[in-house]
Amino acid sequence: MFNHIRLGIIGCGWLGTALGSKLVRQGAFVKGTRTQAEKAKELMAFGIEGYPFQLKEGSWIGDLTFFEHINVLLIAIPPGLSTDQTSNFVAKITPLISQLKKYKLEKIICTSSIYVYGQAQGKLNEDSQCHPNKLSGLQLIEVEQALINNFPDTIIILRLGGLIGPDRHPIHRLRMRSRIEAGLNPVNLIHQIDVLAGLEKVLLTQKKQHCYNLVSPYHPIKEDYYSQLAYQWEIPPLKFDQQTKYPKKISSNRFVSDYDFSFIVEKLLIE
């Protein structure tokens, strides 16, 4: 099914490695980058050609042969502001855009985040106004627009909900807090299984529009969701503030319609 795909993944981490290894098993040729040479070599265990490659502000360090013999590129790197508040994601992506103009790629896919919506409230879709209240959201919007402006015929941006899956779930961070704020807010999450299924749809389907949300349609309030999960996983009871803060339910109806997509993980691990 994927024999015609020659995919390059910039940022072959938790999500990129899962996608790459799955596609390799289905006949695709996959290259992936990691920032360290030793970590890049580890990708061979998944059938992925590993390349050391690191984006810097205004430049990069790495092996540019990564870009040869691929027809699709996935950019799956976070802004990095959680570990470095001075990081300029826009300045890192700008030289990458210049490099990509040298190649004829059928599709460029970029994972973004629902952080771009920030203080926006209510039921939101891709046409809703973004009101980012964090630097990461502001920089993601700039990067999205730069990619759309430079690659209008090939770019597809996926704004992902909060990621959950193998060895990854917000509850492990939230359980360390004495009290969790905005307990009455709806959750906007997505399981790795559904992200991979969505990316497969994008790879196999003709491009429709520039930007899509990819968030589970299951939106219980935080208190109900995390309390039930804590019970299932035998985590001590969590405490929540009985209030909302920029509550929102983010819709993926556009993606579901354009790509004939059905979510696989219906209740985000709730049994």
Regions found by a protein language model. Name each.
Residues L7-G11:
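Conserved N-terminal Rossmann-fold NAD(P)-binding element of oxidoreductases
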Residues T94-N133:
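Conserved Rossmann-fold NAD(P)-dependent oxidoreductase catalytic core, especially the SDR/UDP-sugar
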Residues E142-P166:
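Conserved beta-loop-beta element that borders a ligand/cofactor-binding pocket
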Residues M44, I48-P95, Q99:
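NAD(P)H-binding glycine-rich loop region in Rossmannoid oxidoreductase-like domains
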Residues E49, F53-E57, I235-E271:
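C-terminal amphipathic/interface module of NAD(P)-dependent oxidoreductases
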Residues L196-S252:
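Mid/C-terminal beta-alpha module of Rossmann-like enzyme folds, strongest
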Residues L160-L163, H169-H172, I180-L203:
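Substrate-positioning beta->alpha
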Residues G16-T17:
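N-terminal Rossmann-fold NAD(P) dinucleotide-binding loop
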